[in-house]
Amino acid sequence: MKSDSDLRYETLLPFLSEERTQRFDAVLKGRTRHLSVVLENIYQSRNASAVMRSCDGMGIQDVHLIEDINPWVYNRGVSKGTPSWLTLHRYKQQPDPTGACIQNLRDRGYRIAVTSPHVDGFNVDDVPIEEPLALVMGTEWKGVSDRMLQQAD
């Protein structure tokens, strides 16, 4: 099944110059699914949108949004259209959005790393990246949930 981004790209192709098509292809080949970003209940939608822009700029294709407490609202001024080019996995309608995200990542072979200034762990330069890795960022105020922290590898 093709993603929304794939369908958008295929729709645009007939209208693009050869040079532009080559540029798109080069950018898409630079994308990775080896590293994914998870945003857990980010309070300020503009912060989530800014992270998405960073993911787009670094070639990270998949962004997972856990929205059981704080829903993400599209912020055009900050995101600059990047959600159209990323694959967004939204967890908000399930009975357990955090659990659904964790299960999806585990089923796809991801290890889970959380960002936290409050726990001992790896320095960012020492994080093992041999296997697919999901990097989890929590709310601006409290950070990642206890549950997500317990699930971290």
Question: What are the functions of these language-model segments?
Answer:
Residues M1-D153:
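Post-transcriptional modification and biogenesis factors for structured RNAs
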